Amino acid sequence: DKNSYRAFRNLKDEFDNWDEVAGQSRIKIEKQIKIAGLGKQKSGAIKNFLFSVKKEKGKVSLNYLKNFSNDEILTELTKYDGVGVKTASCVLLFSLKRNICPVDTHVHRTLNRIGIVNTRTPDKTFLAIKDKIPEGIAHSFHTNLIRLGREICKPAKPNCSVCPLLKVCNYDNKNLNNSIKSKENSFMLLDNV
């Protein structure tokens, strides 16, 4: 997500390290991340997490997690207020380079529509798929599903006629109206899946 990345870059550009961020006020953190939305809520969670890790481990670092299993890391990270399954799974994928596919609303919706899962919440979708992603593809699987969900498999009026997964999709309410304008879907990296 562009805005999340920009918020991350703002923090990295403004402060020298995560220990410095931990010492900042929630308002200063919020100023740097507001572009990503929910600035007050997220800044509080970030401050709480960084402060707690620094207090418990002596410095802000995720290195202590490297020898933990994925499930142990999920348990460890979600014990902090404001850190849910999605955030913890993003840490696993993006920071610790684990083969984990975080599940947001787009991933949840597309996997349910296609018929890969039959779950009611993103967290339940995550639990259903977390150990089933073939090694080495979680990152591309995650990013392609997000893009598919944003650009084609939208919540209302999905553009099913251009979907590369149309033939395998189990969604009952397919919208095959060709009049919907769509961006070219050459972004799909499904050959890797």
Where are each of the predicted segments found?
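Catalytic cores of DNA base-excision repair glycosylases
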Residues: D1-N185, L189-L190
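Acidic, metal-coordinating catalytic segment for phosphate/diphosphate chemistry
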Residues: V193
